[in-house]
């Protein structure tokens, strides 16, 4: 299950979790993942594919959740964010999961070079102290909502930990989309549906408060147009 190039737009904000699919989609899937986790590797293709199944209706965000039991996971998370700063997160994501034996510092740099990244910039970026704060923030959401293992998924706030099958994952997203469409039919604005559903799914007030601050109230710039399509609102000099 590989994504179809250009069918789903990728986000461009280097300071937010990388995403596939439009901001304001009625279903938001947050993937809480660890690059050294073997089960996360099995789920990685599904992460890429699910927005392709429901284009325009589903947004996937990749949140870092490196587990302490995996010694190379945090370094890989930092490296992936450094690749994101050069607009290559998803390519780098694919390479890290393709070969989990190359997650040591030298292997991470070698992967960056193979993808054509500016390695000097990559090394500076992955050493930036603010990356740890971001990773800790993303992991805090996982821990607070009960995702102590990986992979974990928040489908409009509803938590599922572990990986069963592609059909099970797709079915869960499809069922949530049905519920989201019911809200839209009642007049709830399309871009408010994911938050409304998450608030209903997250019962603990403290957990909802953290989710709201990190996810709902965080700036959500629109995704870039799919490959081959130009955004008429932006000039060629826009970011």
Where are these regions (language model features)?
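Structural microenvironment flanking redox-active thiols in thiol-disulfide oxidoreductases
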Residues: 51-112
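Short coil-to-helix leader/linker segments, especially the first N-terminal amphipathic alpha-helix
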Residues: 1-13
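Solvent-exposed loop/turn segments at secondary-structure junctions
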Residues: 35-38, 66-70, 98-102, 128-131, ...
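Short active-site neighborhood of thiol/selenol oxidoreductases, capturing the structured segment around
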Residues: 23-37, 60
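A short beta-strand-turn-helix
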Residues: 10-27, 52
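C-terminal cap of thioredoxin/glutaredoxin-like
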Residues: 49, 110-239
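Typically the conserved alpha-helix immediately C-terminal to a functionally engaged Cys/Sec
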Residues: 33, 39-54
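Extracytoplasmic
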Residues: 24-26, 55-57, 63, 148-150
């Amino acid at each position: 299950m590989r994504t179809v190039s250009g069918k789903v737009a990728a986000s461009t904000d280097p300071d937010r979790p990388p995403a596939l699919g439009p901001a304001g989609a009625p279903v938001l899937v947050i993937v809480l993942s660890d690059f050294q986790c073997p089960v996360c590797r099995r789920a990685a293709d599904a992460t890429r594919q699910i927005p392709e199944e429901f284009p325009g209706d589903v947004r996937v965000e990749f949140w870092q959740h490196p587990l302490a039991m995996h010694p190379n996971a945090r370094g890989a998370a930092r490296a992936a964010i450094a690749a994101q700063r050069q607009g290559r997160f998803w390519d780098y994501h694919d390479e890290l999961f393709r070969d989990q034996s190359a997650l040591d510092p030298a292997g991470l740099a070698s992967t960056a070079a193979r993808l054509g990244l500016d390695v000097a910039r990559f090394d500076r970026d992955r050493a930036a102290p603010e990356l740890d704060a971001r990773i800790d923030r993303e992991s805090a959401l996982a821990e607070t909502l009960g995702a102590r293992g990986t992979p974990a998924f928040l489908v409009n706030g509803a938590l599922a930990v572990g990986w069963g099958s592609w059909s099970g994952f797709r079915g869960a997203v499809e069922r949530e989309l049905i519920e989201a469409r019911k809200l839209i039919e009642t007049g709830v604005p399309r871009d408010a549906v994911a938050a409304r559903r998450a608030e209903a799914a997250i019962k603990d007030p403290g957990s909802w408060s953290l989710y709201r601050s990190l996810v709902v109230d965080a700036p959500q710039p629109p995704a870039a147009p799919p490959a081959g399509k130009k955004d008429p609102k932006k000039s060629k000099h826009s970011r």
